[in-house]
Amino acid sequence: MSEINKELIEHAVRDILKAIGEDPDREGLLDTPKRVAKMYEEVFSGLNEDPKEHFKTIFGEDHEELVLVKDIAFHSMCEHHLVPFYGKAHVAYIPRGGKVTGLSKLARAVEAVAKRPQLQERITSTIADSMVETLNPHGVMIVVEAEHMCMTMRGVKKPGAKTVTSAVRGTFANDAAARAEVLSFIKND
């Protein structure tokens, strides 16, 4: 993926401001195109990042039981409206063959996938599939819950409504008790 073209974004933001009847040269908006371009560089930084790279750090550990990192806060941008959605990701896996990854790597992978124009469903499945491809665990279960500003600010206007998605692979796809265990841990604070 190429670098974000901030100059092109600045011109586009100026055009949008003009199109909605604003004066992009007035004091409050004068630097807005630059600020938006800088923000887009940050919030879309995942476009240049492969989440699988985070799972290349492996620790040889004889552990083949559940590992769960829950409540990983994230934010992303809805690809349909380019407005934010944000929430928490819960990442669970059962390692296989001594392949345990660092806990921070799970959070970094969530960030890499979220920081791009995105759909919640794709975030969920991309994290799961990246883990399966690189770690070959017995099972992976990802649960993502998020509030979408496209449902809060426009259209149906339902603030507080949360969308929950899940992706289950391996053991979790076939074992209801294993899925229930993860869900019980997620619910407990």
UniProtKB/Swiss-Prot annotation:
**CDD domains recorded for this chain?**
GTP_cyclohydro1
A GO term from the CC aspect: cytoplasm
Q: Name one GO molecular function term.
A: GTP binding
Q: Which reaction does it catalyse?
A: GTP + H2O = 7,8-dihydroneopterin 3'-triphosphate + formate + H(+)
Coiled-coil region = none
- Record-listed E.C. numbers: 3.5.4.16
Biological process terms from the Gene Ontology for this record are: one-carbon metabolic process; tetrahydrobiopterin biosynthetic process; tetrahydrofolate biosynthetic process
Among SUPFAM superfamilies, the record links this protein to: Tetrahydrobiopterin biosynthesis enzymes-like
Has UniProt tagged this entry with the keyword GTP-binding?
yes
Per UniProt, where does Zn(2+) bind? C78, H81, C150
For this chain, the annotated S-S bridges are: none
Subunit record text: Toroid-shaped homodecamer, composed of two pentamers of five dimers.
Identify the NCBIfam families for this entry: folE, PRK09347.1-2, PRK09347.1-3
Tell me the protein family, please: Belongs to the GTP cyclohydrolase I family.
Q: What is this protein called?
A: GTP cyclohydrolase 1
Whose protein is this, by species? Bacillus pumilus (strain SAFR-032)
GN (gene name): folE
